Amino acid sequence: MALVIGFALVFWAIRAIGSSGGEGFYAVLSHNAMVAIFAPAFLLPLVSVAISLRRFWAEVGGKPLQLSDLMSAFKRAGKMQDLAAGHGEGCNFQDEDRFSHGRRHIHHAIMYGFLLCFASTSVATVMHYGFGLHAPYGFWSLPKLFGVSGGILLTVGCGAMVLLKQKSDRELGDPSAWGGDIGFILLLGFVGLSGLVLYALGATSVMPALLAIHLGSVLTFFLLMPYTKMAHGFYRLAALIRDAQRKRELSVGC
């Protein structure tokens, strides 16, 4: 949270130096300034994750990718199939005598909430550079529809995950990592929540401060991505692809 506040102060200082004279958020911070800040903050951590994934792939004996393996892995990840457990009744990490799909559904909300937010940014980028359609966008535009729905799923999902972790047995995982996991979930939820608040109050006098806080949280999330549980999604997908390869190899061998 200290990093969020720190980055928010940086954005506030940038705004104080001078605005771009644009509309909406761009009246606070120009589009070019946002790109200059966030492009490297997003791409450099991804490069770090990619290098690490390459090493992981070599370590597990990964083979050249095939479309069938990718489709199998993405389908399995999209359904959160492994969180249903082998018997399909869900997890019992809260109570050994009671199985539940709650953890699976919460993961669904977080994952699809994040993907919708990412889709919102991606669509807005295409509209800006490909079609000359610049922000601000109306509520019924794809960037807003994806962003608002994704923000709601992300906020609700992260809040539910924190409550679920409070009830879970910490000894079933690494106790030393529990605090870091909670911190990451709270940060991710704060990104969604601050975005929703910014949208709701974007036409008021508090918009510049809310924009600084939201951008600060997003920048913090990007920079910490390789060092938080966010990275496990990449490794999990790679492991699912490798598992699909092994199953295909076994079926061919039979």
Language-model region placement:
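Membrane-embedded alpha-helical bundles of multi-pass integral membrane proteins
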Residues: 1-254
